[in-house]
């Protein structure tokens, strides 16, 4: 592929030499159209693209990298021009090593300067450092190239701190022009530096030796003075003298601080008096403080003050204290009543309930406030449940066509199953299942279903706190530590007595939940005496299977949530029973609804026939049942703890009967379609499969179906149902654990075969009777007489007309279903052969020519339809031939054979249909 631009050309670089990481400016031609066009930049063989900055088509700025080559070209590569060339080069210099004591304007990477094998993990002591100029003479850099020196001293180094230090290299590099005298002076300097290192520490000690001796003399003099003073007897020993001095100092101190200590004692007494006054002030102000704190809601402060006052003045005998303490008790009693009212107030949160119970416990309230709270909550939950039902019933009577406003889906914090309804209850059964449903269908929830959703939401919002309150009551966490210690024995006795009472409360809540749900969804399952309390919905129509499935999901989620609270299973058994009854009812309703849908399938028959002679009706029937069973998948599935829907024999029998009814309803639809008058057939949408052969012949023009054609289509559908559809449906029933599948299949197959045989006989009667009826008039047309007739010259027209009519039947059946051709033609030929045998047996006698003519026509018919002969038709042909006189001469046999060949040759085109189908008929 030719490039649109010339290759890049580098004509200049500034600077043209430098150490690694030197910033350079590259100039040239065709250096790229932009930053993205630049794809390569190498200097001395090193890739510098990462540091490259494209400025223009003639300028690039970058930094030189750590190249291996000392000198090399600058190569630029672009997308538009490819790999370029260079007319200039860049020289890469080796960086000079900076000594460890040398000043540097940049940060030195010591990893590249020193051998870390010897210096790893240890510092360099100051005395081991070498000066930058160890010889002490002027350094003069040599003019020898670094490369030449490296080649000369291979593997050595000019660094005097290196292990591979080479003195010759160092002298050539730094002192190549130094004279011999100067080098001798340098040796002297080097020796002097070595001596300084060994003499340094010794000189330090020698310089401070006189100081050490002076300190030693001073310490010895002090020691001798103390020993001399201790032996003198002036006013006793030195220790007695010291004791007298200390005693005088103590007396003097007491005299000086006597006044201060007196003031301290007075201050202490005053402080004690103020403390006593403060103690009384607390009691005097306590009634007012209690009222103020109660108004502010600071009950903790009130309780603490009360406990404090009780400990201080609870047993006082002072009258004034008794008076004020009595007022405190009055205020506290009022507080107890206030807290009890707040505790029994509904609705309230679990946190508030625990708080009020703890307050009352700390205040030593009489009775059992916690149990009173539990009882109040129980009544409140029952009241809410019944009020919810009354509200929905009232709303239903007032606005029967509207969705209940009480179901607030948006504010429901519990996981709602309405969101899953489209997955669990949607039945994709064609347009009939989706008709009239728009995006707002979920807001048209039936009132009874919405009530169950609201009822379960209500129970799950109240019962957990109710259960947790009881658990806290049992384990004593509702009460404070002091109250627990004081009333532990009495409370444990109350808990044992009230366990049965609380169990009855839970049972009553579960009973109400189940009864209210049954009243809404299963009104026939509650007794007449309970209908007013739990029912009253005035049900006009049963709920559909999809809404029952949704309600089942709702109740299941409720059961799971209650189980998570660790409520005993025996208390939740009524909910399990409800779920089972709902599942059974849902299955029944869905199957009944499916039967209704299948009954309407006849209206959808479009009579469009495919290559196999089938319409869409069998497929629609199977799809309808499959969708119904799919919608029941979640209902039939057993959740943990649930029983099978089919565990009861009665349920098995009812489901089996409904399944049989579904199959028989469809069979009835087929029968109705086969006998439907022509005027009732809607042919406006009639069509045929464009890939099929010329179906129906001339009917394409007027788009009309005859009753015979409808019979054939229904017969073809019946065959497909027997061989495929019914067996597939049985597999689907078995997949969903239906019981009595063999019975369903046997009864359905028997009904289908009965319909098939009846329709088949009707069709044969319609087609065979005209052909059979035309034989006798055709045989005796023109006053034909078997006793007196001319020698045969060929097959007469009546037989040809009969064959043409049989061919017409073949064509009509073949256009609908190839598989029906052998069955239909075999029966038609049986009827024709039977009639022909009867006619031959009725003839009293035959002449020679008559016998030959009859044998010719019988053999011609038999040979033509040989592939469709059955044992019955073969027997009829045999009887017909036996009724004829036997051929006596070979000339007659030869004439018969010639006439048969002449007949087959003349009607070869008409008889081709029988020959073409021979292989298929043999297989069939």
Swiss-Prot record:
Modified-residue entries (N6-acetyllysine), positions: 454
Gene3D superfamilies, per the entry: Immunoglobulins
Organism of this sequence: Homo sapiens (Human)
Name of the protein in its database record: Exocyst complex component 2
Domain of life where this protein originates: Eukaryota
Function as written in the Swiss-Prot or TrEMBL entry: Component of the exocyst complex involved in the docking of exocytic vesicles with fusion sites on the plasma membrane.
One CC-aspect GO term: plasma membrane
PANTHER family linked to this entry: EXOCYST COMPLEX COMPONENT 2 (PTHR13043:SF1), EXOCYST COMPLEX COMPONENT SEC5 (PTHR13043)
GO BP of this protein: exocytosis; Golgi to plasma membrane transport; membrane fission; mitotic cytokinesis; protein transport; regulation of entry of bacterium into host cell; vesicle docking involved in exocytosis; vesicle tethering involved in exocytosis
Limits of the IPT/TIG domain: 8-93
GO MF annotations, alphabetized: protein kinase binding; small GTPase binding
């Amino acid at each position: 592929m030719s490039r649109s631009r010339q290759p890049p050309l580098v004509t200049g670089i500034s600077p043209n030499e430098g150490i690694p990481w030197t910033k350079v400016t590259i100039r040239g031609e065709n250096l790229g159209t932009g930053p993205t066009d630049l794809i390569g930049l190498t200097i001395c063989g090193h890739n510098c693209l990462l540091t490259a900055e494209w400025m223009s088509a003639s300028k690039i700025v970058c930094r030189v990298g750590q190249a291996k080559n000392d000198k090399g070209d600058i190569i630029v590569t672009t997308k538009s021009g490819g790999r370029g060339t260079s007319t200039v080069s860049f020289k890469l210099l080796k960086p000079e090593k900076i000594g460890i004591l040398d000043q540097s304007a940049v940060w030195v990477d010591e990893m590249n300067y020193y051998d870390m094998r010897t210096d790893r993990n240890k510092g360099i002591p100051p005395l081991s450092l070498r000066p930058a100029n160890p010889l002490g003479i002027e350094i003069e850099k040599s003019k020898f190239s670094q490369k030449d020196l490296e080649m000369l001293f291979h593997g050595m180094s000019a660094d005097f701190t290196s292990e591979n230090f080479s003195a010759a290299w160092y002298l050539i590099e730094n002192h190549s022009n130094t004279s011999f005298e100067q080098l001798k002076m340098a040796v002297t300097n080097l020796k002097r530096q070595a001596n300084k290192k060994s003499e340094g520490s010794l000189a330090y000690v020698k310089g401070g030796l006189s100081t050490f001796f002076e300190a030693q003399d001073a310490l010895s003099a002090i020691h001798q003075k103390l020993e001399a003073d201790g032996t003198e007897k002036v006013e006793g020993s030195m220790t007695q003298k010291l004791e007298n001095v200390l005693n005088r100092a103590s007396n003097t101190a007491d005299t000086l601080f006597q006044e201060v200590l007196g003031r301290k004692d007075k201050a202490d007494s005053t402080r004690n008096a103020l403390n006593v006054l403060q103690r009384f002030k607390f009691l005097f102000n306590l009634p007012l403080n209690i009222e103020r704190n109660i108004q502010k809601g600071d009950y903790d402060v009130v309780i603490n003050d009360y406990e404090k006052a009780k400990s201080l003045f609870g047993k006082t005998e002072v009258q004034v204290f008794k008076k004020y303490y009595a007022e405190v008790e009055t205020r506290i009693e009022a507080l107890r009543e206030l807290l009890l009212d707040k505790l029994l107030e509904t609705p309230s949160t679990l946190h508030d309930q625990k708080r009020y119970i703890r307050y009352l416990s700390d205040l030593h309230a009489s009775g059992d406030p916690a149990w009173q709270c539990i009882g109040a909550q129980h009544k409140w939950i029952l009241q809410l449940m019944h009020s919810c039902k009354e509200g929905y019933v009232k709303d239903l009577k007032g606005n029967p066509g509207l969705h209940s406003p009480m179901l607030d889906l948006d504010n429901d914090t519990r996981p709602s199953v309405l969101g899953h309804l489209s997955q669990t209850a949607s039945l994709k059964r064609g347009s009939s299942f989706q008709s009239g449903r728009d995006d707002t269908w979920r807001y048209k929830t039936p009132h009874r279903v919405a009530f169950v959703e609201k009822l379960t939401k209500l129970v799950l919002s109240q019962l957990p706190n109710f259960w947790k309150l009881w658990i806290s009551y049992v384990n004593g966490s509702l009460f404070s530590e002091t109250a627990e210690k004081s009333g532990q024995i009495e409370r444990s006795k109350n808990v044992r007595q009230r366990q049965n009472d609380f169990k009855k409360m839970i049972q009553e809540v579960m009973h109400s939940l189940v009864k209210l749900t049954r009243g809404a969804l299963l009104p026939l399952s509650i007794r007449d005496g309970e209908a007013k309390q739990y029912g009253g919905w005035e049900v006009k129509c049963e709920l559909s299977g999809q809404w029952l499935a949704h309600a089942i999901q709702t109740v299941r989620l409720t059961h799971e949530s209650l189980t998570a609270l660790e409520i005993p299973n025996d208390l939740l058994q009524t909910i399990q029973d409800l779920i089972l009854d709902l599942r059974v009812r849902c299955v029944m309703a869905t199957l009944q609804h499916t039967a209704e849908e299948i009954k309407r399938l006849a209206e959808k028959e479009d009579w469009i026939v495919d290559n196999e002679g089938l319409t869409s009706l069998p497929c629609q029937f199977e799809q309808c049942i499959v969708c119904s069973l799919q919608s029941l998948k979640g209902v039939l599935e057993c959740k943990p703890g649930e029983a099978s829907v089919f565990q009861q024999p009665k349920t098995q029998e009812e489901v089996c009967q409904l399944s049989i009814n579904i199959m028989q309803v469809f069979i009835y639809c087929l029968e109705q379609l086969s006998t439907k008058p022509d005027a009732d057939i809607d042919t406006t949408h009639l069509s045929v499969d464009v890939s099929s052969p010329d179906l129906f012949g001339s009917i394409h023009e007027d788009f009309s179906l005859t009753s015979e054609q409808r019979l054939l289509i229904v017969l073809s559908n019946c065959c497909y149902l027997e061989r495929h559809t019914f067996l597939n449906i049985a597999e689907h029933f078995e997949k969903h654990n239906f019981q009595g599948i063999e019975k369903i299949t046997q009864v359905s197959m028997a009904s289908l075969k009965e319909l098939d045989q009846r329709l088949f006989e009707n069709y044969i009667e319609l087609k065979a009777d005209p052909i059979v009826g035309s034989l006798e008039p055709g045989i005796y047309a023109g006053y034909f007489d078997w006793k007196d007739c001319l020698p045969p010259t060929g097959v007469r027209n009546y037989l040809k007309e009969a064959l043409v009519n049989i061919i017409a039947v073949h064509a009509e059946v073949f256009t609908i279903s190839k598989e029906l051709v052998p069955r239909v033609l075999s029966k038609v030929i049986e009827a024709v052969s039977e009639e022909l045998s009867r006619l031959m047996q009725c003839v009293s006698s035959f002449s020679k020519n008559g016998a030959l003519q009859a044998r010719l026509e019988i053999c011609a018919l038999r040979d033509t339809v040989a592939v469709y002969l059955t044992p019955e038709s073969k027997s009829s042909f045999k009887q017909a031939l036996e009724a004829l006189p036997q051929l006596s001469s070979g000339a007659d046999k030869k004439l018969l054979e010639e006439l048969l060949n002449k007949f087959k040759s003349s009607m070869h085109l008409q008889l081709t249909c029988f020959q073409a189908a021979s292989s298929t008929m043999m297989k069939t």
